[in-house]
Amino acid sequence: MVSIFRRKVSQTSEPTFKERVQNFWQWYAERAATFHGNLKQKQHSIIQPQISAKVDELLPSAAWVFGDGPNGNGHSFTLTGEGNLHLQFLTEYWRKQAPSLEGWTFYSSRQPSNDLESWQIKIEGETFNPLEFWLAPNLDQEREKIDITAWHPLFAKLPEKNRWTVLFLVLDEALGEFGTQTWIGEINVSDRRLADALPLKELPAFVGRTEDETGWKKYAPTDTWTGYQMNEPHSRFRRGDIITGTTVNPILLREFLQSDDKLEDPLFNTGADFVFVQFPSEILPGGKQIEKRAQIENALEAALASDAAGQLIGGALGTQFAYIDLLLLDGANSLDIVQKVLRECTLPKGTSIEFYAHSKRDRRIVV
């Protein structure tokens, strides 16, 4: 049976995300052997309250699950942002900071099930067996995605919202969280089984064949860079002058633009922040703007990485300013690192560090 646990979102946030991660791993390492034994004895009820409370301290709104380790060896612990790209950057950082613990493997996203046929989920009093899901696939050549139309005999008994909940859970079981995000495109639900549908258990093999036949390459969402262009630069709000850029978090960019620079904090109560460095684009040499900006980006990325304090997530060029997008994980320390690098790069007057979240705009720093 599926066993994903969630916690209510707490309303306070004091430690930085880096501090939270350090605290979590110290706590977990001290109990890893005990947890291993509890799982071996199937004493899940003993562990669940402890883990849920600690995960709530670490990353509110995240979900977690225990599972088998690779090839059935040992146990695994998965912390997932449940498809939320903003949180997936944080869970991936958490995974990279994990200590080596005997008998344990750690994941930052839900993995494909090793035993899909025995997996079930109950919702609204109905038990859903993955073997009863049928999917009609269609290749979207332009987007390099697989569109699907899904059917299950019990869908008609569920409210529409719950149908989607069940469907995404079983897709994640079949392909893993990242597999669903990177391979599956448009999803529709049908009231009947389509003639060209295949059973859910055959979806992983279909994806594998599609990859071989098309040559489409997929990477983790947190490692997938996207280029973009703006057709109508403007001065109505920050970053409105952008002409072109790249990002590993296109959702952040889209949400910022759609909000007209009134973005609700996408990392609220996590101890982390999305920020951007803004400086006059006129200092970049003609014809080599991207190369010069990349030098500054590389310096920032190296300095933040050396202290596990953040990462580069994008950059852009505008008619007035150039931009470097960052994920900061260690509060004031991360900001100090960024300021030090910017001074070493001798950026001009008018350079600033801006917060994406509208509620934190008054925290901007003029370097």
Stretches found by the model and what they are:
Residues 2-43, 59-75, 104-122, 132, ...:
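Long, low-complexity, Ser/Thr/Gly/Pro-rich intrinsically disordered segments that act as flexible linkers
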Residues 14, 25-63, 243-249, 283-311:
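Surface-exposed, low-hydrophobicity interaction/linker segments
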Residues 26-36, 72-81, 144-156, 269-286, ...:
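Short glycine-rich, basic-tinged beta-strand/loop micro-motifs
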Residues 43-47, 83-87, 163-166, 288-296, ...:
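Short amphipathic alpha-helical segments
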Residues 43-104:
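An N-terminal, globular interaction/scaffold subdomain
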Residues 80-217:
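Internal, hydrophobic cores of structured domains that mediate oligomerization or house catalytic pockets
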Residues 102-104, 228-367:
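C-terminal structured domains
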Residues 184-258:
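Acidic, serine/threonine- and glycine-rich low-complexity intrinsically disordered segments
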